Design a protein with these regions (language model features):
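N-terminal amphipathic alpha-helix/helix-capping segment at the start of soluble metabolic enzymes
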Residues: 1-20, 162-170, 187, 194, ...
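Conserved anion-binding
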Residues: 2, 68-72, 77-153, 161, ...
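Hydrophobic faces of well-ordered beta-strands that scaffold small-molecule active sites
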Residues: 3-9, 31-33, 56-60, 84-86, ...
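Structural motif
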Residues: 26, 52, 79, 150, ...
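Glycine-rich phosphate-binding active-site loops on the catalytic face of alpha/beta enzymes
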Residues: 79-92, 189-222
Length: 232
């Protein structure tokens, strides 16, 4: 599977995301729809963007009891999304249920990945707030291995952790990495970050880029810069 840049369309309403995407006249970028936009607009925004030719990563980070997640995934699978996710902290049983619910009668399904640790989480909060007294890379690798055991396609992680995850789970196990910023850009609320070129060198399969593209003076130029740096 080829590398790609996913634009995080973290907008509050439909008109904002459609206005943003209208600048991309020659491309149909892979886009991420998060909780804010999905909860505001519902399934209609997914259907509209699919109709316009975009691949969709639906980023809802499901984390509930296995049966609830399974039933929810049946609903999401019917939207013809291309990728979705759960929290790896929900246990192997929950992730297995998610995959089962996501799989259609013909055996096809979207890519299913698991969140290991949010890129806004650092080692200090991991230890003092979450009471996990292990190094961040060890925790992420453990969660990734659980996702692999559950039959998932990959994980969401920092670019800094892609190499270790591939070492533990194999190069075919996808790493989808937010926390990507240009070297001359602001870090924002991310703690574990890398540039697109760094992410490529570190082995990321997909990068998820939000504000460096959506808040750029020329989003199309910023997107092309990401593609050039990451895909080449």
């Amino acid at each position: 599977m080829g590398k790609d840049v996913i634009i995080a369309c973290d907008f509050a309403e439909k008109t904002e995301v459609l206005d943003f995407l209208s600048a991309f006249t020659d491309r149909k970028p892979f886009i991420k729809i998060g909780m804010e936009l999905f909860y505001a607009e519902g399934a209609d925004i997914v259907r509209e963007l699919k109709r316009r030719g975009h691949k969709i990563f639906l980023d809802l980070k499901l984390h509930d009891i296995p049966n609830t997640v399974k039933k929810t995934m049946r609903v999401l699978s019917a939207l013809d999304i291309d990728m979705c996710n759960v929290h790896a902290g929900g246990t192997i049983a929950m992730m297995q249920a998610a995959k089962e619910g996501l799989t259609r009668e013909d055996g096809t399904r979207p890519l299913l990945i698991a969140v290991t640790q949010l890129t806004s989480t650092d080692s200090n909060s991991l230890k003092k707030e979450l009471l996990i007294d292990k190094p961040m890379d060890e925790v992420v690798a453990c969660y990734a291995k659980n996702a692999e055991i559950a039959g998932l396609d990959g994980v969401v992680c920092s670019p800094l952790e892609s190499g270790k995850i591939h070492a533990v789970c194999g190069n075919g196990f996808l790493t989808v990495t937010p926390g990507v910023r240009f070297a001359d850009g602001a870090v924002g609320d991310q703690k574990r970050v890398a540039t697109p070129a760094d992410a490529k060198a570190l082995g990321s399969d997909y990068i998820v880029v939000g504000r460096p593209i959506t808040a750029a003076a020329d989003p199309v130029v910023a997107y092309e810069r990401c593609l050039n740096d990451f895909v080449g």
